[in-house]
């Protein structure tokens, strides 16, 4: 599996959070595509 994106934490700037969430969505897509 690809590495899970690092959670930037509660006090991270909004652009870091946005980057994290898009990376997380991409990560989940990769995993679910492999599983099914």
From Swiss-Prot:
Keywords: Amidation, Hormone, Secreted
GO cellular component, one term: extracellular space
Example of a GO MF term: neuropeptide Y receptor binding
Biological role stated in the UniProt entry: Elicits an increase in arterial blood pressure.
Gene3D superfamilies found in the cross-reference section: 6.10.250.900
Name of this chain's protein: Peptide YY-like
GO biological process: feeding behavior; neuropeptide signaling pathway
Compartments, record wording: Secreted
Organism: Atractosteus spatula (Alligator gar)
Residues recorded as bearing Tyrosine amide in the entry: 36
Coiled-coil parts of chain: none
Family under the similarity heading: Belongs to the NPY family.
Organism classification: Eukaryota, Metazoa, Chordata, Craniata, Vertebrata
Major localization listed first in the record, in broad terms: secreted
